[in-house]
Amino acid sequence: MLDKACEDYPRKLDVEINGAWPLEILIPRFLTLSDHPSPKMRAHAISCLSSFVPIGSQSLFAHIDTFIACLFKRASDQDPSVRRHVCQSLVLLLASRPDKLMPEMANVAEYMLYSTKDRNENVALEACEFWLTFAEDPDLAPQLHPLLPKVAPVLLDCMVYSEDDLLWLDGESDDAAVPDKETDIKPRHYGGKAHGLDHEGDQQQERRVGAYGEELGDEDDEDYDDDDDFADEMSTEWNLRKCAAAALDVLAVRFGQDLLSVLLEPLKNKLWSEDWLSRESGILALGAMAEGMGLRLVSSPNPHNLLRRKAA
């Protein structure tokens, strides 16, 4: 509950009450809880602390060195939720207090590169946000430029579709020439409600069944509404792939030819790969970099529907 309050109302908590500042008591307590045996408590503590970074809370900044030391200590935590909040905190610090990270940037960069490749996509996404934030600040360009040879290829690899993406894209295959199966065209459910017919009085409501023969209750109607919106949500949801593409886009604007020199060989390998997923990620990368570098994509025949759409 306190975690949510810190996240939603950090400014309301960073106030003076009867001559005292509650955060001056809470911040040291959160720092102590970051070492709690429970990973859930550690994650909540770091999350609470990070909520006060964007507002420039002096109660937190009075302990900023201790906070950063706490993040470094928890960087290798076994719990992915804790690591995710560590990455998130480092992103917020980079945006608000880059001066505090620059002395340790070599170590921070190595950690964030490692985390960008984390198996847990939530951790990887937060780490990828670090590079997007880094690239968006023109004042940090001199510090980011030497990291391009390491950062850019990692971002390129992050643009390959994940297993979850592929599950969603299963319906995107080019199957116009394939006859529909019965399950493709069968209505989801039958019955009065499906056709806007209501039953009143003592009339027995018509039995409704789903596409697989199961009997449906009233609560299932909302489930179907949710299912209808699921594809749209998936297509617009911010994820690792989109974050990496956005970071490459900004890097292209910022560094232009220098970025292309770094990515020329990896891009060539992607575009000539026998794996269509790798080829697609290469095309996406070129598209992301095109505006910053003045590139133009030329459409060419390709056997996979998604590849044709990307190159068009």
Go through each PLM region and give its residues:
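Extended amphipathic secondary-structure runs
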Residues: M234-S281
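Hydrophobic residues within the alpha-helices of tandem HEAT/HEAT-like
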Residues: M1-P10, S34, A45-G56, L71-A75, ...
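Acidic, serine/threonine- and proline-enriched intrinsically disordered linkers and terminal tails
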Residues: K150-A246
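Hydrophobic, aliphatic-enriched repeat segments that assemble into extended interaction scaffolds
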Residues: D3, L113-K117, E121-D180
